Amino acid sequence: MYNGSCCRIEGDTISQVMPPLLIVAFVLGALGNGVALCGFCFHMKTWKPSTVYLFNLAVADFLLMICLPFRTDYYLRRRHWAFGDIPCRVGLFTLAMNRAGSIVFLTVVAADRYFKVVHPHHAVNTISTRVAAGIVCTLWALVILGTVYLLLENHLCVQETAVSCESFIMESANGWHDIMFQLEFFMPLGIILFCSFKIVWSLRRRQQLARQARMKKATRFIMVVAIVFITCYLPSVSARLYFLWTVPSSACDPSVHGALHITLSFTYMNSMLDPLVYYFSSPSFPKFYNKLKICSLKPKQPGHSKTQRPEEMPISNLGRRSCISVANSFQSQSDGQWDPHIVEWH
């Protein structure tokens, strides 16, 4: 621990605003990504490179969600960290690693769609699932190398009434952490915007009556990727850039401090919104979700014999039996139907 001049702003509203935001992000993000992971693990028989990228995006988002209860507890205690030095380092590292991983794989998904739409005959489109898995492992290694410094530094700051655990220093620039924070936004932003523009432009040039529906689906998908990315990451990057531009006059400024904390919560909401990417990635994903919803809404009435004939069974039992048959039919069709590509390019 160190006793540096950490910012401690009394009477601020951060501790009141952050817990509800993080709780909402945790509940919706864990639910959405949990359902997505179940779909990948139990209803996906044929894996393709794009499937591998989307699966790792869901893994990064789900792991980030696991960290949010600890940050919620931190804010509920008025920014007092009660778990010690090592858990603080591990928590901040896990948050940064999975946030960066989510950005990387969201960018890879956009780039993968770019090659399939704009350059359908490029060699990138013929790589095997094993090669895609190797690419994923390399990307995870780079992400870990870029964030491992958070494990090597002490982030606790002891004050009179609390012990803070923050990855950002609000008194001055933060060196490598600020560099990584900016790079992991602006580089992917350039790639995603480029891919979005080229996909939309290419599809509009090739627009034909028979392809209009596919064009709309592909355009909608890439626009969802771009909107989710910009909405979740631009506010926090802008807040940090404003601080760096105005420091030292903005050091420990309550409004600047509060803006950074609140906009950082938007980056966690990226993991809550990424299920929209899965939803628009394939027509089979909405079908999977709807079938789960239908089966969960069917009432259960125990106590009926298993040997009942269909004409003697209550409607609710017939509904349950139909749900089981629907689920089995979905699983048997998943080989060919749950393709994570929106469009089939010939």
From Swiss-Prot:
GO MF annotation list: G protein-coupled receptor activity
Known glycosylation sites: N3
GO cellular component: plasma membrane
Subcellular location: Cell membrane
Outcome following mutation: T267A: Diminishes the response to L-lactate
Source organism superkingdom: Eukaryota
Pfam families tied to this protein: 7tm_1 (PF00001)
Extracellular compartment residues: 1-21, 71-89, 152-182, 242-261
Keywords assigned by UniProt, alphabetized: Cell membrane, Disulfide bond, G-protein coupled receptor, Glycoprotein, Membrane, Receptor, Transducer, Transmembrane, Transmembrane helix
Result of altering Y233A: Diminishes the response to L-lactate
Topological domain ranges for the Cytoplasmic compartment: 43-49, 111-130, 204-220, 282-346
Expression sites by tissue: Expressed abundantly in brown and white fat. It also detectable at lower levels in liver, kidney, skeletal muscle, brain and pituitary. Not detected in frontal, temporal and occipital lobes of the cortex, basal forebrain, caudate nucleus, nucleus accumbens and hippocampus.
Record-annotated membrane-spanning stretches: 22-42, 50-70, 90-110, 131-151, 183-203, 221-241, 262-281
The protein's name in its UniProt record: Hydroxycarboxylic acid receptor 1
Protein's organism: Homo sapiens
Lineage: Eukaryota, Metazoa, Chordata, Craniata, Vertebrata
UniProt gene name: HCAR1
